[in-house]
């Protein structure tokens, strides 16, 4: 074996180590193109942790929940909520922050048929989210689409009707059922 071939392995290893050292000192790590950066594209720009009060309204009644150091409680008597209800509230709020509408219909698209066709006049239930005493978002939920995978939603103070993934409304419905004792 010639001297040239004997030095090939150690030279390649030294070059590889040199490249790693260069990457460490330059701070330029190649970004994987397989990973997608998280972007909150939901209808609520506020971070879920900022929401400290939730009001739920439905035909069966109205419920208010407050978040404190010990977790979610009923506003009326301060009783802590069961774990499943707490999870439903937390997940519902997160979904409002991260789940983008599948479709947004402007007023001229739905005005001729009216909101009743989408189950929004009156809405099936409403969730109002607060930061302190300030309402951040009021979401009125209507009927699911014919395939039952999407649901119509309207935000209070806006003219658009949103078509949201059904799991968003289902999580609010779990919280409503728990609040109503069912």
Task: Spell out what each predicted region is.
Residues 1-182:
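A short-motif feature that recognizes glycine-rich, charge-decorated loops
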